[in-house]
């Protein structure tokens, strides 16, 4: 289905959108009015086309939700509405009547059901997927409504059990993802793995494993998967005053996070958080640190990640429509860290017979997602180094007319070999067109 528009644009999503909130800090800082043109304009200009959660419940704040929908419509941004008035025991007609209160807005794209539910073997014990089977199945029966649930990711170092949660191994995680796909009948799949909270590009094996799992179940159930990208860190759902750490990730790491997700088959990119919740800024002695996270700071200013996010989204806009129509078949990797972190990658696939960084001493290497649609092949090549640019040489089985596509490049070349130059963390899509000779 088309999640954004009839053109089939790739969803570029933000979690935590503008909302109605009144808060005053101990030092007298007050939350601004987020439900204004300026915030939606900033979101649009960054390339975001969908907000999948705003923290507002239509059942409790109908006027504020309607205002958000109206503003989003003005700036051609979609919104998923959270509405606790939608219940699993309602009939199809009752659900349709309830949603008719806001579904007439062009910005209405679906319903936010729940974030990070668990199962008996994975996640929180007090918020189980099974609690949402009925409402998910009933909302899923509407052709024009997406019911949005975001899952946990697999973190092997989290394994353990306490009073509230249970974290087990990959087999249990896969059972959790399968339970969701099988019993909730979703139109899309997503999970949030924030690599830079604990790891680096060099130690990204678990990150790529998560992408592999999501892609597997997305293909099995013939739905797209979306991957979350972290804009900052130091989340603070506990609402406690916290000392500030050094800020992370770096801009090129965000670029890499997006491009590797696309190479691994993601058909949607979701950023967290879009608008920094005010409590994510709580610092000692009543101070507020607005620099920690968010595309937009809680004080209303653009964050240090705004420019790199906009750049990443320009890349998605350039290649997204092609990738949305193609299926990932195999990963190719070359270079020490690329090969270590993608252990099931090969060194060639299909018409791509060789991919080599020109600087063989670069340990980070390069990777490529190998895509097909019918008989057409495409290769999404990514520089796995977030500090240094790389030149990459690719050799194919024959000479082809090739389309080279990125936010900074659109070329048609005819060759058996090509070289592409990639900035740190950057990617390029190579689409094979007509074979020139055998």
Predicted regions and their residues:
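Glycan-processing catalytic domains of CAZymes
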Residues: 1-398, 406-408, 412-435
């Amino acid at each position: 289905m088309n999640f954004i528009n009839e053109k089939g644009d790739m969803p570029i999503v933000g979690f935590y959108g503008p909302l109605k909130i009144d808060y005053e800090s101990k030092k007298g800082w007050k939350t601004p009015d987020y439900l204004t043109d300026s915030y939606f304009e900033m979101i649009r200009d960054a390339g975001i086309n969908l907000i999948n959660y705003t923290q507002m419940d239509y059942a409790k704040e109908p006027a504020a939700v309607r205002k958000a929908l109206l503003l989003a419509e003005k700036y051609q941004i979609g919104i998923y509405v959270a509405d606790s008035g939608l219940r699993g025991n309602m009939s199809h007609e009752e659900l349709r009547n309830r949603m008719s209160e806001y579904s007439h807005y062009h910005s209405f794209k679906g319903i936010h059901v729940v974030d990070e539910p668990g199962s008996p073997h994975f996640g929180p014990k007090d918020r189980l997927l099974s609690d949402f089977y009925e409402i998910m199945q009933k909302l899923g029966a509407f052709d024009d409504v997406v019911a949005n649930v975001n899952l946990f990711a697999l973190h092997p170092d989290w394994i353990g059990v306490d009073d509230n949660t249970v974290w087990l191994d990959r087999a249990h995680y896969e059972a959790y993802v399968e339970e969701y796909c099988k019993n909730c009948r979703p139109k899309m799949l997503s999970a949030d793995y924030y690599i830079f909270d604990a790891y680096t590009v060099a130690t990204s094996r678990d990150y790529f494993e998560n992408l592999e799992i999501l892609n597997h179940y997305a293909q099995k159930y013939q739905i797209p998967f979306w991957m979350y990208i972290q804009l900052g860190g130091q989340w603070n759902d506990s609402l406690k005053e916290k000392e500030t750490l050094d800020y992370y990730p770096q801009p090129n790491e965000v670029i890499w996070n997006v491009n590797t997700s696309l190479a691994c088959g993601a058909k949607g990119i979701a950023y967290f958080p879009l608008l920094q919740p005010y409590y994510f800024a709580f610092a000692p002695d009543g101070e507020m640190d607005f620099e920690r996270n968010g595309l937009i700071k809680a004080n209303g200013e653009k964050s240090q990640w705004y420019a790199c996010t906009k750049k990443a989204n320009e890349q998605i806009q350039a290649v997204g429509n092609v990738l949305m129509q193609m299926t990932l078949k195999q990963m190719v990797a070359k270079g020490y860290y690329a090969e270590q972190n993608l252990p099931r990658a090969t060194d060639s696939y299909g018409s791509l017979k060789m991919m080599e960084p020109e600087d063989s001493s670069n340990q980070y290497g390069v990777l490529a997602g190998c895509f097909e649609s019918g008989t057409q092949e495409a290769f999404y090549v990514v520089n796995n180094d977030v500090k240094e640019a790389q030149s990459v040489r690719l050799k194919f089985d024959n000479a082809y007319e090739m389309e080279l596509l990125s936010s900074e490049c659109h070329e048609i070349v005819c060759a058996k070999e090509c070289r592409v130059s990639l900035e740190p963390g950057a990617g390029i899509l190579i689409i094979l067109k007509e074979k020139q000779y055998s």
